[in-house]
């Protein structure tokens, strides 16, 4: 299932939900100035650079956790109870605790309670420091509210914790630029309550607190609780989001128009923006636009925001939301079992009346 809407600069045009992915997806054609804040000890050329960064924690909606203790590098996670009540809940760099100038992390050590599973997990592992440092050092270009393009860098290490002890780390900045660092597997542990805890420290071991958290609108929306009632925990779902990647790329068709910036969120939690100046004409067609780069595996769209100028000169903003099951089924039909041998592009077309998109 896919939903879309297009907003004009002056008039808002709501589009009826597109309840199917037609031969759309299925008809995929086979085929200067560094923006980071870093400082280095001049007396030691090998000193590790320092960046201004903080930690954010994500949990899927309906699956709250409480930390017993947690460190990301030398930075402690001060918060305890973490829960998400609205999207984006997976790959969101907002809600960080605090930022400070510090060395980037090389390891994590975290112990937490999974409320839905009623068990404790621990993850103690080295993480990919080289990848993290490269991401922070190289940064990315971003359009700021006044329309200028400026070079920015990441400012958050995002910790995603899903049922089954699944942990995904991203480098992020807000929710517009999110890049995966890696996926890690925690182990279940038998954590006993030590003596001498005060009433607050006791909460993580309290059955009463667990029931309160699982049945409170403050931690899990009522609609989510009712939808998940008597259903098993979908273990493996969050791995599925990142495991299903294919060799594909999007092509945008704007009839006699011009493409603007395109912002995308993916099901694996990553997100990014393609600036309009980075687009090229596809197959020499003036109103077909794509990013001219090597075709490589990429995750599946979750949300797409397309800005463009129509033939009339009117500017529009089109938003599309992709249903996981529908999108996954469509891609599987196209790519089959030999995913490494197939490449494809997804055609995204704006109709001439600027009222809906087709795929």
Name what the model sees in each region.
Residues 283-359:
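Hydrophilic extracytoplasmic domains
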Residues 29-32:
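C-terminal motif of bacterial Sec signal peptides marking the signal peptidase cleavage site
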Residues 127-169, 328-341:
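Low-complexity, Pro/Ser/Thr- and charge-rich linker/hinge segments at domain boundaries
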Residues 40-64, 239-262:
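Short, surface-exposed binding/anchoring microloops in extracellular/periplasmic proteins
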Residues 68-114, 263-316:
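Tryptophan-paired
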Residues 151-273, 337-359:
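Activation corresponds to long, low-complexity, non-globular regions
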Residues 2, 9-17:
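Positively charged n-region of N-terminal signal peptides that target proteins for export
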Residues 34-36:
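Bacterial signal peptide processing site
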């Amino acid at each position: 299932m896919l939903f879309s809407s297009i907003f004009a600069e002056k008039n808002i045009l709501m589009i009826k939900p597109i309840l199917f992915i037609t031969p759309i997806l299925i008809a995929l054609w086979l085929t200067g100035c560094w923006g980071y804040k870093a400082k280095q000890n001049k007396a030691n050329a090998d000193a590790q650079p320092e960046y201004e960064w903080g930690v954010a924690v994500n949990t899927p909606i309906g699956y709250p956790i409480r930390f017993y203790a947690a460190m990301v590098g030398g930075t402690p996670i001060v918060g305890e109870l973490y829960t998400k009540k609205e999207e984006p809940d997976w790959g969101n760099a907002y809600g960080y605790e605090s930022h400070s100038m510090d060395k980037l992390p090389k390891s994590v050590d975290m112990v937490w309670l999974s409320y839905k599973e009623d068990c404790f997990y621990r993850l103690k592992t080295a993480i990919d420091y080289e990848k993290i440092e490269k991401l922070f050092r190289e940064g990315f270009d971003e359009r700021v509210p006044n329309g200028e393009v400026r070079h920015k860098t990441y400012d958050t290490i995002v910790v995603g914790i899903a049922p089954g002890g699944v942990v995904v780390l991203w480098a992020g900045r807000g929710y517009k630029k999110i890049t995966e660092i890696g996926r890690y597997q925690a182990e279940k542990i038998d954590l006993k309550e030590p003596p001498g805890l005060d009433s607050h420290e006791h909460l993580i071991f309290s059955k009463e607190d667990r029931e309160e958290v699982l049945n409170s609108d403050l931690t899990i929306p009522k609609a989510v609780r009712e939808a998940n009632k008597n259903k098993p925990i979908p273990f493996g779902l969050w791995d599925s989001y990142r495991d299903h990647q294919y060799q594909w790329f999007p092509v945008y068709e704007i009839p006699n128009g011009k493409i603007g910036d395109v912002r995308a969120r993916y099901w694996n939690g990553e997100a990014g923006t393609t600036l309009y100046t980075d687009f090229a004409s596809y197959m020499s067609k003036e109103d077909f636009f794509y990013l001219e780069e090597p075709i490589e595996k990429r995750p599946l769209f979750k949300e797409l925001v397309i800005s463009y100028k129509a033939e009339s000169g009117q500017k529009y903003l089109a938003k599309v939301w992709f249903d996981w099951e529908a999108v996954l089924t469509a891609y599987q039909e196209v790519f089959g079992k030999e995913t490494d041998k197939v490449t494809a592009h997804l055609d995204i077309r704006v109709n001439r009346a600027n009222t809906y998109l087709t795929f």
